[in-house]
């Protein structure tokens, strides 16, 4: 018994020294630490994804709470008398020139507009008001679509005109965007005829005055 105990005590330092190298079982502590690190990383990723989902849901809820209204309806218009030509006036006072579009496609005239305004009630809340219209008109056969002109008056009236100009049946009509000219005073055909008549009368009066002085 004394010998066996002495033998075990004599081998104990050697076994302690060579134990990590001569052990029949691999050391499991590093594997456990790697698994713990991986689990912590997965938990952090899961927490980040949950936070992103909450933020996304909060953003969607805030967007849903912002009131907005979209109105799509035609604007009022009238056909002006211009002999055998084409004259059209649309009430577009709620739209700026940049928000209007006039497009000529063949013998079709497509007029559209879209505006968006932010309305604030003064108490920290606001809403958006969107207004849009799309209207289409047919050009007369005696009107050349390439001569269509468009102008916007200071009162918000959009004037579209085209003089009489016959086309041959074989001539193709191209597609184009009609530019909108902004003017402070747009003269209608009736106004032009009256103005020309008044100018002629004034010139006649001046000529009569000069002849009397001679």
UniProtKB/Swiss-Prot annotation:
Keywords annotated in UniProt: Stress response
Coiled coil feature spans: none
InterPro entries from the UniProt entry: A-crystallin/Hsp20_dom, Alpha-crystallin/sHSP_animal, HSP20-like_chaperone
GO cellular component: cytoplasm; nucleus
A Pfam family it matches: HSP20
Gene3D superfamilies: 2.60.40.790
Single Gene Ontology BP annotation: protein refolding
Domain of life: Eukaryota
Family assignment from sequence similarity: Belongs to the small heat shock protein (HSP20) family.
The name this protein goes by in its record: Heat shock protein 30
Organism whose genome encodes this protein: Oncorhynchus tshawytscha (Chinook salmon)
Gene: hsp30
